[in-house]
Amino acid sequence: FVRVNKLNVKINYDDILVIESLKDYIKIITKNKNFIVHTTLTSFTESLPRNKFIRIHRSTTAAIDKIDVIDGSNAYINKLPYKIGGSYKESFKNLVVNFN
């Protein structure tokens, strides 16, 4: 559950595509809807299952099984490109090698 506009909203991990940082807030992008939540990306990412999500940029966490294409420094999710940050490339590369 996440707190959105004074309500506790249930979001299934399998519905999450990407989580983006918005300073003291995050935007949780799901298949059907986006949610703005008052928390930090680091804090929220730490609460997620590590086998399902990976930090790919200082402002982005992605659902591993939702990544469709990897093109150099971008991961494409739902046909949209998300930049893979330099300090996250090595762990991302290891994940891709181990995922296959």
Locate predicted features.
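Eukaryotic intrinsically disordered, low-complexity regulatory linkers and tails enriched in Ser/Thr/Pro
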Residues: 1-5, 88, 93-100
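Conserved binding/recognition cores within well-folded domains
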Residues: 1-77, 81-83
